[in-house]
Regions:
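Membrane-embedded alpha-helical bundles that constitute the cytochrome b-like, heme-associated redox core
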Residues: 1-194
């Protein structure tokens, strides 16, 4: 029995040593808070407008804080760590299609593009939602239409995001959902991109 306990303790200890913190407490709190805000806004849409508006304003504040952190933060929080150009994203997606993409410790190029798309979409939803509460923009058809289109668009992006997370989790044998909860990922190996 002592050998079993000892082996289990060694396994747990080696797992701790082989993982590194990637996602800061801020990034994790931002991520799950935005998930909550978007879910509440979507569920309350057309039903409980005060709740819908509060969720939208909260999402807008979260986006503003993420923009600041992306420019002034550190490590994997910074945009320059994961924002790549279209050629790099296309090349990465081609590598995915051929099954030879590299594992990234932070966001891979497709994940970075998705972060930007989600931030832009939620920012647009929050902005057009706010515009509808002002005298100048209330009842303006293109503002309402844009709000609805972006609201549906964010659902598509969320589906792609979740699909990408599940795909990458399976492909690289790594639970990325757990990583966004704990902040820790498997340490980079020599063939990974740190």
């Amino acid at each position: 029995m002592n050998a079993t306990v000892s082996t289990r303790e060694t396994s747990v200890e080696s797992t701790r040593e082989a993982s590194v913190e990637v996602w800061s407490p801020y990034v994790r709190l931002f991520h799950w808070s935005l998930v909550l805000c978007v879910a509440v806004a979507w569920l309350s849409s057309g039903e409980i407008m005060k709740v819908h508006e509060l969720a939208g304003y909260s999402a807008g504040v979260l986006i503003a804080s993420r923009l600041i952190a992306g420019l002034a933060g550190s490590g994997y929080t910074r945009f320059r760590q994961f924002v790549r150009g279209p050629r790099v994203v296309s090349s990465y997606l081609a590598d995915v299609a051929h099954g030879d993409e590299k594992r990234y410790l932070g966001h891979n190029p497709a994940g970075g593009a998705m972060v930007l798309a989600l931030l832009a979409c939620v920012a647009g939803i929050a902005l057009t939602g706010w515009m509808q509460t002002t005298d100048a923009w209330w009842g303006v058809a293109w503002v309402e239409d844009t709000h609805k289109i972006l609201g549906n668009g964010v659902l598509v992006l969320i589906g792609l995001h979740v699909g990408g997370v599940l795909f990458a989790s399976l492909r690289h044998h790594e639970n990325l959902v757990r990583a966004m909860i704990t902040g820790r990922k498997r340490a980079a190996s020599p063939q990974d991109v740190g």
